[in-house]
Amino acid sequence: MTEKIEGSKFLDSMILGSLLGDGSIEMPTGYAVNPRISFTQATWEKDYIDYKHDLCNELYKTNNVREAHNNTYRFGISSKEKILTESMIAKTRYENNTRKLPKIDEINPVVILFWYLDDGSLTITETKRKNRKNSLSRKLKISLQSYKDDDILKFISDFKKKYDIEFKPQYETIKGNKKIVSICLNNNLKEIIKFMDLIYPYKNLIPECMHYKFCICYKKTLQMKSDDYSKYNNCDIINTGICTCRKKDFSHLL
């Protein structure tokens, strides 16, 4: 049974997951003397950042959500919350302030949930197959562009041991160097379902504007025959063939 994470542990796990995603630790500038934790989301994710703000405000001194540049909203936790900030710096930063991934003992389903909601995606596309009916392909991806390759590979190994979910590194060539930019579960529905099993218990706590990230467009196949996985649909694809989350019509494939 998955551990139930709640209270202050849920909040601190949300903050850690956000720092792996769209959150940041701002170093002091001007008259400021202490770093602080801040959160940023797109304007259409306003309910989501309000939710994060309300959680943080229950335990930490937090400023109001405000409009920022490039169609975003943001807020920060007071720099006076030194114990929290120092703890998060220790978990997510090297001494030179470059990013590091937390130890696997610090990773739990709530950390994974907010990391995925911030920096993850689940794309569903039509795959053409020769002499056979086309099918749905799924790719779950979490961006990791600011981390060392060795740290990412170690994280993949540790995550596999802890949760029996095997991410694959995805590389891109950047300025002539091959670099890991994300980890993914590519066209492996069983692994994607195991990932969803981890985070789904918390879905109803999350604003509806983010529920599309839980939608796997599941329908029974010869290999996957259970009806249970249809709970991971945030659309009525089983009856209509249409994924309203992605505004795509897959009826000709089903």
How would you label these PLM feature ranges?
Residues 1-254:
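Internal intein/HINT superfamily modules and their associated LAGLIDADG
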